[in-house]
Amino acid sequence: MKESENVSLFITSFYEKKFLKLYFSYFRGKINSTQGFMKKLSITILFFLLAFCQINAQQAKYVFYFIGDGMGVNQVQGTELYLGELEGKIGITPLQFTQFPYATVATTFSATNGVTDSAAAGTALATGNKTKNGAIGVLKDLQTPVYSVATWAKERGCRVGVATSVSVDHATPAAFYAHASGRGSYYEIGKDLYETGFDFYAGSDFLQPQDKKNPQAANLYSLADQYGYTIARGYKDYLRKSKKPTR
């Protein structure tokens, strides 16, 4: 099967049949509990990274990167203890991802604060660099850009997507495609979304589609066509519009 056919098959089978159906069901309230949602996908999913690469025996076909909001060792162990209690036993019932063959831990302080925030933490998770609280995709000098693993994947010919339960220009998802000295620069972050050129974005809209500093500037919705993107609102609209567009 050709690479293009593999990509088409993946988009159809995964995005349409699994992820997006679950994604929209959760926010419509059809999945009522966080626990129920986690069993099918992840607890409090904020971000997801998907990369499709040319396949060979030494290379992963898909890569998923999940970030749970504020989720650390205590939250994971607490959940496992809770699941154990539900089964009436002493000890834990392991979660799926804690059984993976490899695991590690990371420090959580930022470059300037003992307690990080979503922007600095997102930048560290995306790029491997600590930065100042509030900064996205730049070092603590607020000028030097750093690039995410998603950008590296895109540069190597992979297809990349970002999905979040918050707005697409929020700090954590933005850390994978944007460069901003302040996380509140939502319009500029939205422009970076287009300019980075990933293949798929999903979230709860833009926080600031219009540039408050320059009302004459094009709003972010109108830029979609210019950059070759199609905007879909809701699962049914996505199904209607996803047959032809590539982004």
Question: Which residues make up each language-model segment?
Answer:
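Bacterial Sec-dependent N-terminal signal peptides
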Residues: 8-10, 14-15, 19-58
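N-terminal catalytic scaffold of extracellular/periplasmic and nuclease hydrolases
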Residues: 58-246
